[in-house]
């Protein structure tokens, strides 16, 4: 695999938006309640997506492909996913899992996964935070996307809808997948 993936037009557009935003950002926050899904299942998921087939379980319509550019074998901080998904248009993303202590987004829940989407120079363009904690019926999860301030509103709405669908899928597939695979890691 080449070190630098081919860019889709959406990557170039995001880099232009980032420059025009001049360091200003906005946050998109989406809250979820997941019945029958535990924080431990979600913790397991992040390091065990592993294949495009498994990645597509998370959003059968929009997720197209997945591979580790840098695997999480030694812990997920520093791991890089290379994914293709459809958020209004085909989007190639390189997401690097970051140390939660370096999160520019305040963390409020007991479990947190922090990621940055990388530009062609491996610098963060956007940030995301999945944070979650147990509730009586399962897990409450909050996703926060920190985006350049000049991101078009239609993209923000498409991202919100994508996130709602993707996180809601956890309740459908994750309990069984976790139960079948939790000891094989």
Predicted regions: what is each one?
Residues 60-119:
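Glycine-rich portal/gate segments that line the openings of hydrophobic small-molecule binding cavities
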Residues 30-32, 94-101, 125-134:
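Hydrophobic/aromatic beta-strand elements that line small-molecule binding cavities or substrate pockets
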Residues 174-185:
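Short, highly charged C-terminal tails/helix-capping segments
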């Amino acid at each position: 695999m080449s070190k630098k993936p081919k860019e889709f037009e959406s990557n170039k557009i995001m880099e232009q938006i980032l420059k025009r935003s001049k360091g200003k950002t906005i946050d998109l926050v989406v809250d979820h309640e997941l019945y029958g899904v535990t924080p431990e299942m979600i913790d397991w998921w992040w390091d065990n997506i592993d294949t495009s087939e498994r990645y597509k379980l998370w959003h059968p319509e929009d997720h197209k492909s997945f591979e580790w550019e840098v695997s999480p074998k030694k812990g997920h901080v520093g791991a890089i996913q290379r994914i293709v998904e459809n958020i209004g248009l085909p989007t190639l993303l390189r997401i690097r899992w970051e140390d939660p202590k370096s999160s520019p987004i305040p963390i409020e829940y007991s479990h947190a996964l922090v990621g940055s989407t990388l530009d062609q120079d491996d610098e963060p363009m956007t940030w995301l935070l999945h944070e979650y904690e147990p509730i009586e019926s399962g897990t409450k999860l909050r996703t926060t996307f920190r985006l350049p301030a000049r991101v078009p509103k239609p993209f923000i709405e498409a991202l919100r809808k994508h996130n709602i669908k993707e996180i809601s899928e956890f309740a459908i597939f994750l309990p069984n997948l976790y139960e079948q695979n939790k000891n094989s890691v």
